[in-house]
């Protein structure tokens, strides 16, 4: 497994804004840094969130010396205001806790920095989001013997846009090494992983929102689960912005770095 040091490494594991990780967004009324939706669906005034493929995992229970927390964070930077919650850890191993907490704060900081666009003059507000139903919200999602992970779901609105949009970022830390685990660490063969996910994800989505042509970017928004890997697949705003789908281990195990699988064992 490749590891990366420092705050910049933590940022790599996150999909901070739509444009940074291929997130689907609408073409005409978004910030300049946000890409066009990968689907041809016309956005509506509110996203449709049909029943997920399976219930969203709950907030992790305290374990292995760590306690999950949600910390309120409110402020302003330039033209961006935010009033959100951050998943944080207390207790446990100092290096692991600090790497996780710093990574979460970096994700919010990057979102605040990038949403105003290149000119830095677009007014943006950021609040807590929910991919729902479930709910699927910001939380510490995993506290395991070898890994801790969290997700941030925020609803942001750029002044003049027709509707707000969801953003998703995830932070996954190897608690044996206090190093982030990235999409690159998960799948050494990027091309093979993309092709496999393109084949299996639509069949695991009973809502029909994910098609093969949706799966055309690195799915860097993901969380480990005991049964597999939960990916947050970007779709059009009208389809819900992101579709959470858990891919069972037996569908992707042969493509996952063999050193990673034991780390995710719960």
Could you describe each region identified by the protein language model?
Residues 2-9, 19-171, 175-266:
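Compositionally biased intrinsically disordered regions enriched in Thr/Gly
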